[in-house]
């Protein structure tokens, strides 16, 4: 049975995004461009519940997307959200997360305002497409590379599907 999470007033666009070993939730990926700190706290609560109940993560790690890992980094929104998430006993808040660490299992759910989240989402999409184009170019360079491509073709197709933004 689906029901509302107590204390959550605003929903977020929260896609599951690929990371090195599995997936993470990005909340908000673009629905709420301007957020209040309470909204980011609520996104953390939603991410925690979803990752636990649906994805089976026992103690989901919630991170706040920011320009640095130190608590004093970011603007007023990030400072206030950091304080709220730190005090919230319903989430396992692990602190600030830098964008470069997100794909490497830094957190199970990453919270941010929708403006920042949409930039992260679109960057993810672009990097995935650029990498696939690079792989194609390398595999077309020589006969040896073309033969190597044939050996890993099924794995490359699976990776392409996993990185396809239409999948998330």
Go through the PLM ranges and name each one.
Residues 15, 53-57, 89-93, 137-141, ...:
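Short, surface-exposed, polar/charged, turn-prone segments marking secondary-structure boundaries
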Residues 33-99, 108:
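Glycine-rich phosphate/diphosphate-binding loop of Rossmann-like nucleotide-binding domains
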Residues 1, 24, 73-77:
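Intrinsic structural disorder
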Residues 102-103:
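Structural alpha-helical scaffold elements that stabilize or flank donor/cofactor-binding regions
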Residues 11-15, 27, 44-48, 63, ...:
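Small-side-chain structural scaffolding
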Residues 24-36:
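Low-complexity, intrinsically disordered basic tails/loops
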Residues 2-10, 16-22, 26, 106-110, ...:
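Glycine-rich phosphate/nucleotide-binding loop
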Residues 25-28, 61-67, 113:
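Short beta-strands and strand-loop turn motifs
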């Amino acid at each position: 049975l689906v029901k509302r999470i107590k204390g959550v007033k605003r929903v977020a666009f929260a896609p599951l995004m690929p990371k090195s070993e599995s997936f993470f939730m990005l909340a908000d990926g673009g629905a709420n461009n301007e957020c209040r700190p309470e909204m980011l706290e609520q996104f953390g609560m939603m991410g925690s519940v979803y990752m636990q109940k649906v994805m089976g993560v026992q103690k989901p790690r919630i991170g706040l997307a920011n320009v640095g890992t130190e608590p004093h980094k970011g603007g007023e929104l990030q400072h206030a959200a950091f304080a709220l998430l730190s005090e919230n006993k319903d989430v396992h808040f692990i602190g600030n997360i830098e964008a470069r660490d997100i794909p490497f299992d830094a957190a199970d759910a990453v919270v941010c305002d929708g403006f920042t989240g949409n930039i992260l989402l679109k960057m993810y999409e672009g990097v995935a497409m650029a990498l696939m184009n690079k792989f194609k170019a390398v595999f077309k360079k020589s006969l040896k590379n073309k033969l190597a491509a044939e050996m890993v073709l099924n794995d490359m197709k699976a990776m392409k599907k996993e990185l396809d933004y239409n999948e998330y």
